[in-house]
Amino acid sequence: MKQFFLLVCLCLWACIATAQSQDTPLNGKKIENEKPPIALYKFISHQRDTTYLDTTLTIQKSYKFNYLRSDTFELLPFSNVGQTYNGLAINTTSKRLTPLFAAQSHHYNYKEIEDVSYFNVPTPLTEIYFKTAFEQGQQLNAFFTINTSKQFNFSLSYQGVRSLGNYQQSLTSTGNLLITSNYFSKNNRYNVRFHVASHDILNRENGGLTQNSLALFINDDPEFSDRGRLDVNFEDAENNLKGVRFYMSQEYSLLQKADSTSTTALTLGNSIWYEEKLFEYRQNTAYEPYGASYEPVDLYNKTTLEDFNIQAYARLENTLLGNFKVFTTLTDYNYGYNSVLNLDNGQIPNRIKDNMVSVGGAYQKQYKGFDLAAQAAINVSGATTGNYINAAAGYSLNEDTRVQGSIKIHNVAPNFNFQLYQSDYVNYNWKTEFNTIKTQELGFDLWSKKVANLSLSYTGIDDYTYFAINPSQSQEDTFLRPTPQQFTSRVNYLKIKAEREFNWRGFALNNTIMYQNVLSGSTVFNVPELITRQSLYYQDQIFKNALFFQTGVNLKYFTKYNSNGYDPVLAEFYVQNEQEIGGFPVIDLFFNAKIRQTRIFVTWEHFNALFSKTNQYFSAPGYP
């Protein structure tokens, strides 16, 4: 607490000192209403791509005004803000050499290293995001950044969410803290970046509605219009995902491009990061449908991961040859539990450990109008198998049209909780020996102002892993639970997405349509065939152009499909082919406004629910 108080005091002192130096120029005369150009407010991504502060109001900003601060077109949210999302589409990762941690359904709001940005601003910059939540709750994101000098920037952001929810035992609580800093030497030869990220994502779990409550909900019984009166399967469970990460990256330019005639630059760098993750599941009393338990009361599962990485790299930039990067990474991870589990038919270990070395490279070049890029990496030592190759070529046909083709090949071990899991529930304990997941993807993208933005991908997956109800369980076994499984055949998956906006005077119609087809493996790979979103709105300026507004209606629809089910013990989704969801539109009414740099969003969500005679909208089986 003392350190945090000192940090806040230093920030306030820096704000005051910077404000004084900016308000009073060297000649002693105060300059009124002088504002730096917006292009001086720079946002720098992990990949060192630079964007600028954007205070405009667009329909895309409305799509991103949510808990994740991103467009959720391919996601289906649960009933309460801060809960998980069911995926309407599958996006395969392509640059990962190690397995992922447990509880992936709760990682949507977990900032990984690639999600962290750094900043460079001429004056202190603050952004406050506030949005109401369900039943005694609020969402708040607070962001502050300042340059104490031209070379050093510091930023602090915090996301806090607490929402009781409309259904019993669905409270959510999120507290995510991110601190970043970056420094450039005056000659721009040396640069260092640092961040600390802390996550605390709590969800109380209820197991979904009981069968009787599901019938009352579907029939829209007026006595249960207050959703809090519907019974849930249990009222005494919660899970919690926590994580903390320390990251530092620095580089030094041995050779610099001094001017436009220089042809070569050489940079050496290294990165080091350490991360701890913790997933906990608590339940006061064992829930019978999950099967027998080692403890009848006060059930508690704790899964941990310690992940340490050191990377060294060299980057060569040459006007003629292109940009090259080579790197090597040392990784040491330790996943698991505190004790070994001894069973009648064997033993379940408590740890998965490895110390591995990977090497890789990247290349980028502009050649005769083509933008060429490639990345590759492979684990060369250690027990963990993993590699990837990504390549892309883009070409601008004209100022309005650009095309790109890509290929991705990725092999990686299944997530840790597919390999090893321990729980106080007897049925939730396993140690598996699965094959490496092998993914190949061909992609094509078109960006055209006159036609549409189009993306097409064809993905093939061998040894696809998933959670599902074991089909070998007897019909007399009422304790059906998801277990890790690996598909012995190949999954082939086609996805086509198109976006286009039509404008006429002050009216606009924004369209997003996605078509999906699982050509093989549809029994284990559940996605809707069609997803569509249309936004019809009107925009204009009023009050002598002091206020810019947009008002209209959003419609989102996806076809019926066998949605994945949700398991609160694992905090994972599992494949089920018994119950379909979807086939219903969700219509929102909205009014957005911008006054100077303030943006206001007012939305009446799911407006058409007022006119439904029955309720068929679910986020997952058992979860309205």
Labelled PLM ranges:
Residues 138-160, 169-202, 250:
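Transmembrane beta-barrel wall of Gram-negative outer-membrane proteins
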Residues 188-249, 277-287, 295-299, 303, ...:
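Flexible loop and strand-edge segments within Gram-negative outer membrane beta-barrel domains
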Residues 99-101, 112-118, 122-144, 165:
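Short strand-turn segments of transmembrane beta-barrel domains in outer membranes
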Residues 1-57, 203-214, 610-616, 620:
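Cleavable N-terminal export/targeting peptides
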Residues 25-122:
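Acidic, small-polar-rich N-terminal luminal/periplasmic segments of exported/outer-membrane proteins
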Residues 156, 292-294:
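Long, disordered, Ser/Thr/Pro-rich
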Residues 3-4, 21, 121-123, 240-283, ...:
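Exposed, low-structure sequence patches enriched in small/polar residues
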Residues 39-43, 49-50, 55, 131, ...:
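Outer-membrane beta-barrel proteins
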